Amino acid sequence: MLMRTATPLDQPRAIGSARVSSKRVNGGSGIDGLRQSGALKLLFPTSRDIVQATLINTAGGVTGGDRFDIDGCAGAGSRLTITTQAAERAYGAQIGQTGEIKTNLKAEAGSRLFWLPQETILYKDAAIDRQLGVDLSTGAEFLMVEPVLFGRRAMGEDVSTLAFRDRIDIRRDGAPIYLDAIHLQGDVATHLDRPAIADGARAMASLVWVSAEAEGRIDALRRIIGRSGGVSMLHPDVLVMRLLAADGYILRRSLIPVLDLITDDTLPQSWRL
């Protein structure tokens, strides 16, 4: 029998999907629908008022050829928070292979949906394509944060070469209220060192808060972040923030007080570990 040499395409790839929805139940919130398969799992800490779903990637990270799909829906009048058990790690990929993460979220009228994943750590030669689509109904409250680390500075990790494409599309009743795209490729470290881009920072976070309360808290949020970022109102109820930091530890030092203020100290416990 002839033996064939393995190629990069022969390597096993991680595929996973997770879907969760919430509904109003007896004055609180409960799980309405749940599906999970492959390398994505969901855990639910006990809570009557909020459905808190914790995503777990059993593959241990994302690399070229992996595919993950996440769907979340907060039904009318319910509260749903989706977070991750730990930081997601994007490892080096084979040439021509890209890992894909697609997330679709929906918040119906009178609901509250928080999308609070922990950091995504990009390692040398990572190749990641992420898409986040959000569909809001009038009267829905929404919060998202997306922290990203370019290597870990304390470990001396190099991010001189990687490919990172990230797109966020938030719409309300079908009309766009926030569109953002990041595309970094090649010698990312040199790009990040430029004063007009990141001025040497190796950690960043994007935050969007859609709430009638947002404008009233903008001054308090500015005091928390100081000169580490910027915060402004895109619309009377749409607040956006961008943070930069030298590393992940410093980023968290600013980000957790921000999230505590916005969530009224209901930040998932996994963020405290």
Curated annotation (Swiss-Prot):
Name assigned to this protein: Urease accessory protein UreD
A Gene Ontology term for the protein's cellular component: cytoplasm
Subunit structure: UreD, UreF and UreG form a complex that acts as a GTP-hydrolysis-dependent molecular chaperone, activating the urease apoprotein by helping to assemble the nickel containing metallocenter of UreC. The UreE protein probably delivers the nickel.
Entry-linked InterPro entries: UreD
Similarity section: Belongs to the UreD family.
Highest taxon listed in the record's lineage: Bacteria
Gene field: ureD
Keyword terms of this UniProt record: Chaperone, Cytoplasm, Nickel insertion
